[in-house]
A protein has these predicted regions:
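Conserved C-terminal "switch" segment of AAA+ ATPases
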Residues: 2-69, 74-79, 152-160, 187-197
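Short hydrophobic/aromatic residue motifs in ordered secondary structure
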Residues: 43, 100-101
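Short hydrophobic/aromatic segments of transmembrane alpha-helices and their interfaces
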Residues: 12-13, 25-27, 84, 234-235, ...
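Soluble catalytic regions of large protease machineries
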Residues: 93-96, 102-277
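Short pre-active-site segment immediately N-terminal to the catalytic Zn-binding motif
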Residues: 83-93
């Protein structure tokens, strides 16, 4: 596999793709490169094309930083589907859900900074809370992963606290949290009970029509312990998110109300709402 380019590599790729595109003086490729961690060369080419299309659509002579910002959201979060008809009730649920993610992400230390929160449907999601890492990360600390579990659970917790019910909207969050917790236990040795061991060995079985299958190399008793540890980690994230959101219920209400009114909030706007400005 080809590794994803680092910040210098991304700047170089952007230079190549923008060489034939007119840019305004305020466009700084270095800043765009810094704000696109994890982007592949193809993603960056797509970003430049999208920004150029946006500028052309708005009859601009050159591409601006705003065009790049909007294009980045499109590449990262999917295309806006404003034509999708959503009931007021569903919109309200989505606002609480995304406000829950955003508030937990903002209140926990050592997490990736918030980039944007929206309740405009994008791709297959009804809303999106986007975080952007400050710099390249190749390894993750245990605490960072603990916090990530709480952030993933924030949406479901907010629904329960504010609406007193659960929806299927948290399905993907739950899947991602369970997968992360399983890796913490089975691959990264981050469970005190299970110790620094790998459970399950990956074997290539491409010829059988499978890419990778996890081969079980442990007893049924160990399998039960693994399941318990995974559950403990995910429920730990759930409990932390619930506690944070209950303590800051008023801010949660204000944040979801602001989302209902404005549909999209950037990092500064979220910060101001949390600070009560």
């Amino acid at each position: 596999t080809v590794g994803r380019p680092d910040v210098k590599g991304r700047e170089g790729i952007l230079k190549v793709h923008t060489s034939t595109v007119p840019l305004t003086d305020e466009v700084e490729l270095k800043i765009i490169a810094r704000g696109t961690p994890g982007f592949t060369g193809a993603d960056l080419a797509n970003l430049v094309n999208e920004a150029a299309l946006l500028a052309a659509r708005n009859d601009k002579k050159a591409v601006t930083m705003d065009d790049f910002e909007e294009a980045k959201d499109k590449v990262m979060m999917g295309v806006e589907r404003r034509s999708m008809v959503i009931s007021e009730k569903e919109k309200k649920t989505t606002a609480y859900h995304e406000a829950g993610h955003a508030l937990v992400a903002s209140l926990l230390p050592g997490t990736d900074p918030l980039h944007k929160v929206t309740i405009i449907p994008r791709g297959r999601a009804l809303g999106v809370t986007m975080q952007l890492p400050m710099d390249e990360q190749h390894t993750y600390q245990k605490n960072y992963l603990y916090n990530s579990l709480a952030i993933l659970m924030g949406g479901r917790c907010a629904e329960e606290i504010c609406l007193g019910e659960m929806t299927t909207g948290a399905g993907n969050d739950i899947e991602r949290a369970t997968e992360m917790a399983r890796k913490m236990v089975c691959e990264w040795g981050m469970s005190e009970k299970m110790g620094p061991l790998t459970y399950g060995s990956k074997e290539e079985q491409v010829f059988l029509g499978k890419d990778f299958s996890s081969q079980k190399n442990f007893s049924d008793q160990t399998a039960k312990l693994i399941d318990q540890e995974v559950k403990t980690l995910v429920m730990g994230g759930y409990d932390r998110a619930t506690e944070l959101l209950q303590k800051n219920r008023a801010i949660l209400e204000n944040l979801s109300q602001a989302l209902l009114e404005r549909e999209t909030l950037n990092a500064v706007e979220v910060k101001n709402i949390i600070a009560g400005k």
